[in-house]
């Protein structure tokens, strides 16, 4: 046997042994035999590096020092899930599904508390691994993910597929890691989720390999070739992915809740952290029929476990002004440990919330973290209230500018409507420069506050006139940081226009809505001239957003600001694929079978450029099926329904 054949044999044998060990939990050889073969492969590859295969298991342990993480644009939108926190809220969602789908069936899965990632395979080989990021753009973490031993470098089938899952740190490995950090004098991680996220952002891949991350895969992001979520998970197992075995088929709310109760009992016994249960409509065609909101699928929901609570005392209340003028109360409290972090402040939301709970300074309260992130006051312990405590004094004037505060009838918030309120301007500047908006690195709250206080900037357009000399007048800003900020400001001029639109801070327009708006109108100037009717035609965007956008661009201030930004050289064009009226505009199209000329992602991009909505399953709402070679059940179903069929060549001819 020649060396190339020997390397191939060892690689395939070791990958099979790893699959048996990590996925099937049924090892067929002793560790010593695996180690012997592994060392033999290491030696052969070292002597013949040109023969090292892409799926070699040695990629999992070898060390690479990365320069950083490059951005990765996902070819598919990776939506987050909506959350519910009670049986009543879950029942509302289930009833909403039932109104659209007759006799829906569900799959209930554990919600793993880790870091979301996507794996991209071509011809069965792992080519790219990326974080979810904002759902459109994440970070390429391929080298680190290759060090996770249960992630297959080569699938059991030579297919193109994109899968989503969760990387997590098992509790045993988390305890070991924190013990090592304490011995080294480093700060322990607060929880396994933070440890997993920190590990995947390591530049030294040897550290990733050492820490022992693991994964569970749960969704096909590329158009699915199965009919149900249950079939998708079974197919994943056949391909070699690690799939969580704790799942249940359910037909109604009672059966869903039975699984949630079982998951609650299991929670402390599992070798990994979970923070809830995900409920999905099982049938993929029905998922397609239900569709998406701007942020989340309508066919799935995440039930989050009740949050951990802690008792503390309210010492004082601060009132702060946000960029939209909303005045928010925040409680200062006796510091207390909650969900493994020390908490000393909690939001009180608004005046109605304070009055409803009758919150007073000096009260003992129970606090919790909503979604395990934001501290909130849940309950006042009235039996511990000292005598004589007076109710909170509600401000009538803005704490920043002194203007009268307004309480509109249709709102619960107090609002400062002074457009020149310094707090609002400062917060708008901070928002504009933030990561999800224009991403001006180095231009954080401290620097912006100083620029504003020194009257070096008064609106976002002024940022593009800043010089290194201006920045050097600020406290703790040296030459290197000043150059970095000026460079980041210049770079932000080239951003795609949805970043700018989000950065303008128009009410109701978040990142997803901004992207949908620019996909449709292609240019910020064109959007600024759009009517409410035109905007309302965009799927997932309603009249509230349409009214907010049109009202904003009708103001003199917005018109002046656009001129200033354009004169400063800021890009107004959307740099992604534009959904203009095309031959397939508004059509729902399904791809099936093997394509011989185009990659599946290329075919999807071409269809979307023609205005199509690309779906993963065939239903009565499907307008067209593009069928490649060896097309199976989807093609048969389309023919039965009388749906128009195209070949790959038909698509290429366009």
Swiss-Prot record:
Residues 579-654 form the BRCT domain. Belongs to the NAD-dependent DNA ligase family. LigA subfamily. This is DNA ligase. DNA ligase that catalyzes the formation of phosphodiester linkages between 5'-phosphoryl and 3'-hydroxyl groups in double-stranded DNA using NAD as a coenzyme and as the energy source for the reaction. It is essential for DNA replication and repair of damaged DNA. NAD(+) binds at residues 31-35, 80-81, 109, 132, 166, 280, 304. Coiled coil: none annotated. Its cofactor is Mg(2+); Mn(2+). It comes from Lactococcus lactis subsp. lactis (strain IL1403) (Streptococcus lactis). NCBIfam families: dnlj (TIGR00575), PRK07956.1 (NF005932). Its EC number is 6.5.1.2. Gene3D superfamilies: 5' to 3' exonuclease, C-terminal subdomain (1.10.150.20), 6.20.10.30, BRCT domain (3.40.50.10190), DNA ligase/mRNA capping enzyme (3.30.470.30), Helix hairpin bin (1.10.287.610), Nucleic acid-binding proteins (2.40.50.140). Zn(2+) binds at residues 398, 401, 416, 421. It catalyses: NAD(+) + (deoxyribonucleotide)n-3'-hydroxyl + 5'-phospho-(deoxyribonucleotide)m = (deoxyribonucleotide)n+m + AMP + beta-nicotinamide D-nucleotide. GO terms for cellular component: cytosol. CDD domains: BRCT_DNA_ligase_like, LIGANc. It is an enzyme of class 6 (ligase). GO terms for molecular function: DNA ligase (NAD+) activity; metal ion binding. The active site is at residue 111.
């Amino acid at each position: 046997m020649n060396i190339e054949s020997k390397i191939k044999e060892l690689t395939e044998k070791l990958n099979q042994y790893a699959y048996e060990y990590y996925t099937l939990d049924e090892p067929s050889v002793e560790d010593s035999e695996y180690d012997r073969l592994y060392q033999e492969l290491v030696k052969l590859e070292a002597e013949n590096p040109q023969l090292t295969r892409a799926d070699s298991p040695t990629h999992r342990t070898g060390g690479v020092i990365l320069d950083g993480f490059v951005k990765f644009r996902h070819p598919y939108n990776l939506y987050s899930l909506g959350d519910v926190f009670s049986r009543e809220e879950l029942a509302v969602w289930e009833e909403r599904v039932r109104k659209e789908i007759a006799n829906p069936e569900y799959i209930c899965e554990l919600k793993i508390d880790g870091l979301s990632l996507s794996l991209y395979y071509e011809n069965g080989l792992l080519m790219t691994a990326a974080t979810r990021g904002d759902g459109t753009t994440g970070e390429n973490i391929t080298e680190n993910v290759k060090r996770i031993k249960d992630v297959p470098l080569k699938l059991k089938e030579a297919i193109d597929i994109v899968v989503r899952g969760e990387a997590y740190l098992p509790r045993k490995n988390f305890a070991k890691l924190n013990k090592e950090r304490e011995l080294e004098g480093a700060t322990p991680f607060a929880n396994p989720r933070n440890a997993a996220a920190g590990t995947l952002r390591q530049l030294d891949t040897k550290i990733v390999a050492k820490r022992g991350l693991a994964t569970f895969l749960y969704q096909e992001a590329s158009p699915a070739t199965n009919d149900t979520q249950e079939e998708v998970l079974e197919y994943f197992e056949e391909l070699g992915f690690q799939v969580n075995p704790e799942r249940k088929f359910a037909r109604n709310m009672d059966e869903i809740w039975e699984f949630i109760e079982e998951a609650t009992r299991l929670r402390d016994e599992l070798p990994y952290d979970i923070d809830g249960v995900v409920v999905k409509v099982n049938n993929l065609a029905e998922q397609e029929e239900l569709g998406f909101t701007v942020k989340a699928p309508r066919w799935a929901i995440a039930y989050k476990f009740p949050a951990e609570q802690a008792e503390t005392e309210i010492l004082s209340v601060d009132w702060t002004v946000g960029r939209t003028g909303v005045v928010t109360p925040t409680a200062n409290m006796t510091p207390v440990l909650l969900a493994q972090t020390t908490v000393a402040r909690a939001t009180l939301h608004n005046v109605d919330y304070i009055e409803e709970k009758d919150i007073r300074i000096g009260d003992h309260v129970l606090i919790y973290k909503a979604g395990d992130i934001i501290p909130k006051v849940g309950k006042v312990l009235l039996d511990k209230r000292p005598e004589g405590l007076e109710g909170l004094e509600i401000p009538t004037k803005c704490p920043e500018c002194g203007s009268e505060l307004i309480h509109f009838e249709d709102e619960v918030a107090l609002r400062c409507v002074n457009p020149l309120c310094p707090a609002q301007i400062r917060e708008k500047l901070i928002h504009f420069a933030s990561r999800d908006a224009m991403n001006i690195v180095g231009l954080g709250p401290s620097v912006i506050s100083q620029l504003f206080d020194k009257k070096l900037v008064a609106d976002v357009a002024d940022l593009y006139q800043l010089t290194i000399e201006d920045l050097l007048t600020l406290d703790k800003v040296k030459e290197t940081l000043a150059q970095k900020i000026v460079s980041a400001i210049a770079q932000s001029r080239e951003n795609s226009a949805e970043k700018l639109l989000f950065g303008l801070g128009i009410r109701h327009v978040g990142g997803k809505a901004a992207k949908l708006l620019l996909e449709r109108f292609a240019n910020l100037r064109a959007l600024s001239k759009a009517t409410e009717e035109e905007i309302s035609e965009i799927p997932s965007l309603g009249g509230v957003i349409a009214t907010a956008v049109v009202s904003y661009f009708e103001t003199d201030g917005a018109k002046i600001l656009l001129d200033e930004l354009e004169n400063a050289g800021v890009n107004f064009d959307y740099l992604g694929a534009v959904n203009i009226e095309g031959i397939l505009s508004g059509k729902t199209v399904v791809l099936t079978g093997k394509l011989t000329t185009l990659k599946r992602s290329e075919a999807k991009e071409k269809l979307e450029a023609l205005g199509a909505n690309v779906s993963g399953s065939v239903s009565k709402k499907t307008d067209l099926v593009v069928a490649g070679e060896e097309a199976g059940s989807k093609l048969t179903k389309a023919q039965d329904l009388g749906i128009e069929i195209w070949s790959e060549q038909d698509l290429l001819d366009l």
